[in-house]
């Protein structure tokens, strides 16, 4: 089992920010990544639909023999975390609690903002996670169009700036000093988000904290990859267009994406792979 890959799942390419952090902290591990781009974005979908798509992708990862699951998607974490932990015999790591932990440590005023998809914000998953953090005030804002910009590779420009100013106005009015990027796509928008919020506001991504949790679970369960094994290899699967996934995904992860293949469940619809 120690030689098995870590399974990472997201609705698209955003979870590659988490994959990048995992590889930085655990360079000796191999990854198997599934991006459900055929059904992205998850944010506008009903929770039950998100749960169904997410569990189908997680089923594929478990069937492929991963030793640990990372749900690198806030919407999916909110929709199916409890189900996943009951359904599978491997450990499950998610992104909401790690981001909350980092934000609580970072805030000076106790006023924290969280931005995310409609599914994440309406689930109130962050409110639940912050319930035990005394002295904090949470302001939540849905930013439904951000994921589409990122999936299209657009991370700057006048249109995006105007949209960001409109989305973040409630956080500015609430005078938050910390903002959780409550979607793993959003770290690619830190330039425009940071510009709008100003230098005094800390932006919190769940990626590094989730990677730390992944490290802790591997250590706890004795699942570190045997260093005597051959060098680790990584596989990237998508339910959508592999060429588009590879093009945008390399901006998140870098040269580790040498090829993207169609996920098994999507193979009847498309049977192709793209290399570099």
From Swiss-Prot:
This is Glutamate racemase. Pathway: Cell wall biogenesis; peptidoglycan biosynthesis. It is an enzyme of class 5 (isomerase). InterPro entries: Asp/Glu/hydantoin_racemase (IPR015942), Asp/Glu_race (IPR001920), Asp/Glu_racemase_AS_1 (IPR018187), Asp/Glu_racemase_AS_2 (IPR033134), Glu_race (IPR004391). The active site is at 73 (proton donor/acceptor), 183 (proton donor/acceptor). Pfam families: Asp_Glu_race. It comes from the Bacteria. PROSITE patterns: ASP_GLU_RACEMASE_1, ASP_GLU_RACEMASE_2. One of its GO terms (biological process) is peptidoglycan biosynthetic process. Belongs to the aspartate/glutamate racemases family. GO terms for molecular function: glutamate racemase activity. Substrate binds at residues 10-11, 42-43, 74-75, 184-185. Keywords: Cell shape, Cell wall biogenesis/degradation, Isomerase, Peptidoglycan synthesis. Provides the (R)-glutamate required for cell wall biosynthesis. It catalyses: L-glutamate = D-glutamate. It comes from Parafrankia sp. (strain EAN1pec). Its EC number is 5.1.1.3.
